Amino acid sequence: MWCIVLFSLVAWVYAEPTMYGEILSPNYPQVYPNEVEKSWDIEVPAGYGIHLYFTHLDIELSENCSYDSVQIMSGGHEEGKLCGRRTNKNSNSPVVKEFHIPYSKLQVIFRSDFSNEERFTGFAAYYVAEDIDECTAFADAPCSHFCNNFLGGYFCSCPPEYFLHEDKKNCGVNCSGNVFTTMTGEVESPNYPSPYPESSRCDYQIQLEEGFRVVVTMRREDFDVEPADSEGHCPDSLLFVAGDQHFGPYCGNGFPGPLTIETQSSALNIIFQTDGSEQRKGWKFRYHGDPIPCPKEVTANSFWEPERAKYVFRDVVKITCVDGFEVVQGSVGSPSFYSTCQSNGKWSNSKLRCQPVDCGAPEPIQHGRVEDPESTLFGSITRYSCEMPYYSMECEGSEVYHCSGNGSWVNKVLGIEPPKCIAVCGTPSEPFRSTQRIFGGSIAKIENFPWQVFFSNPWAGGALIDEYWVLTAAHVVEGNDIPVMYVGSSSVVTSQLSNAQMLTAERVFIHPGWEVLDPSITRKNFDNDIALVRLRDPVKMGPKVAPICLPGTSSEYDPPENVLGLISGWGRTNVKSHVIKLRGAKLPVAPLSKCREMKGVNPGIDISSFVFTENMICAGNDKGVDSCDGDSGGAFAVQDPKENKPKFYVAGLVSWGPQCGTYGIYTRVKNYVDWIRKTMQEYSAPSVD
């Protein structure tokens, strides 16, 4: 058995890129063998196409060249498939079939089946590299704008103000980096209203002075950007970014956003992005700088000057706190402050607050107390009171104070002055009830005469009329500028005086009308026998120490005849020179003539030679009750005719008398009230050494 072995020849040929070449079927020009498949990979230098042409073609003919064929492939695409016999169509050219391939590579494949009824000689073909116009040879333009062909290739270029992307094919516009700093202006897309560039990103910035916000105004008809796709995404878009604020992205025919965009920033970024597809006319808008507003309310409980509906950058206002409120900076309070609307839309001094005025703790007072108020802020109330019953308010209605808007405690009567507690005058803690009418009077308690002052040298008396002042007779302190005085003791025994209040004189004021005589001359003129002693320290009042009232200046304080007055002291009695325990007595007022008619102890002294004036009061009787030596300067106390309750005023001061136990002369204090008050007022403050 003979086995016939058939073989097929399969060949693959590759060569370096060349500018031309020849391709021949197997055994050409002889009969090609059966069952052959051979391919040729043709490659010319990049940038060239291939011109392939056949000068001979003799291949078994079949439908669709399904038996034997020569096939031309380019990039997986069949450029042609040939079979049969071909002859040249032009006698001047040997070419029977040709192909112009715009690529630098192609493949030629020859196939034959297992038998041929005739002798076919195959094909002869040639190729040559030829320049192609890439700018027109392809359905898709290789360049987005300008295509430039050259031998073996091409390059893309762009219009002015455009640049070529890294792919060397697409153009973009260099539209980033533009910064607009004017207060008004217009911004538009590249080429507006001509189509904007594709595949671009434009970044613009509006940068205004701090304190001004960017406001954009757009007309709908000035906006035409490729519309959104079916999913709502914008292929081309315009976006505004101002800090944390984002407006957009916007796209479509006609601006879809608000026609006025008010940002809250002085800087606005405009981002315009396009893809590589559809381009439209783009957009334009205007902008301006609007001063950044500040909120109207800086702080509560205040009012502003000037009053405006709107406050903007650089506006300055004066903020004044309403009554009862103040601004506290450190430890200093002020009723107002200034604030400026700043570039960030906030007020300067915004941390300052109008807070209730704090009047602080009420001022303490002497001889009184003040309630601890629940609060010391504006509108709070506090009350003062005096140490009753020995002190009372100097002014009626001065007890209640309220914290006022100016930070002071204010009283309706006294204003900002604190109240003053003054000693209650003319009211003994124990009334003097003795009815004894004998020379020397009766023993008394100091509580009966709490105004009684004891002068130890000379032995005399005085009347306390104020915490700093003692009233006495001029002849008591004449030549004695620093008298030693005591109050608050019934007994003037040295051991008892240690429990009394010792008074230190600061200054002595003798009435200017008092006649100063040589001590060797017998005094017959006691007119103006009155003096004041200013104390260095205030006297503390109590049940044993209290002042007597001064008289008024009206005629009611001229005591009529037979009105009883009280006298007290440690003067001489009918049994001894001086007493050590306080004695008191009641004396009636008598006509001055009674004192003129009296005869003195010394028959050699003519009483009629003594001076009698209207500045004197005569009091006493012939029953042995009278003031005497050692009582000088003491008060002749009479009940105040204008008071319902017993209250005594100093009607007179013990001055002189012709004889103890009868009538005596008293200085009429009413006539000196003006001098007393003037002196006390002028020297009210203690002197400072």
UniProtKB/Swiss-Prot annotation:
It is found in: Secreted; Cell surface. One of its GO terms (cellular component) is extracellular space. CDD domains: CCP, CUB, EGF_CA, Tryp_SPc. It comes from the Eukaryota. Cleaved and activated by C1R. Immunoglobulin-binding promotes autoactivation of C1R, which results in the cleavage of the Arg-Ile bond in the catalytic domain. Inhibited by C1 inhibitor (SERPING1). InterPro entries: CUB_dom (IPR000859), EGF-like_Ca-bd_dom (IPR001881), EGF-type_Asp/Asn_hydroxyl_site (IPR000152), EGF_Ca-bd_CS (IPR018097), Pept_S1A_C1r/C1S/mannan-bd (IPR024175), Peptidase_S1_PA (IPR009003), Peptidase_S1_PA_chymotrypsin (IPR043504), Peptidase_S1A (IPR001314). It is an enzyme of class 3 (hydrolase). Residues 292-356, 357-423 form the Sushi domain. The active site is at 475 (charge relay system), 529 (charge relay system), 632 (charge relay system). Ca(2+) 1 binds at residues 60, 68, 113. Residues 131-172 form the EGF-like domain. Disulfide bonds join 65-83, 135-147, 143-156, 158-171, 175-202, 234-251, 294-341, 321-354, 359-403, 386-421, 425-549, 595-618, 628-660. Residues 1-15 form the signal peptide. Residues 16-130, 175-290 form the CUB domain. Cleaved and activated by C1R to generate Complement C1s subcomponent heavy and light chains. Glycans are attached at residues 64, 174, 406. The record marks 437-438 as: Cleavage. Keywords: Calcium, Complement pathway, Disulfide bond, EGF-like domain, Glycoprotein, Hydrolase, Hydroxylation, Immunity, Innate immunity, Metal-binding, Protease, Repeat, Secreted, Serine protease, Signal, Sushi. Component of the complement C1 complex, a multiprotein complex that initiates the classical pathway of the complement system, a cascade of proteins that leads to phagocytosis and breakdown of pathogens and signaling that strengthens the adaptive immune system. C1S is activated following association of the C1 complex with immunoglobulins (IgG or IgM) complexed with antigens to form antigen-antibody complexes on the surface of pathogens. C1S is cleaved and activated by C1R to generate C1s subcomponent heavy and light chains. This is Complement C1s subcomponent. It comes from Bos taurus (Bovine). The lineage of its organism: Eukaryota, Metazoa, Chordata, Craniata, Vertebrata.
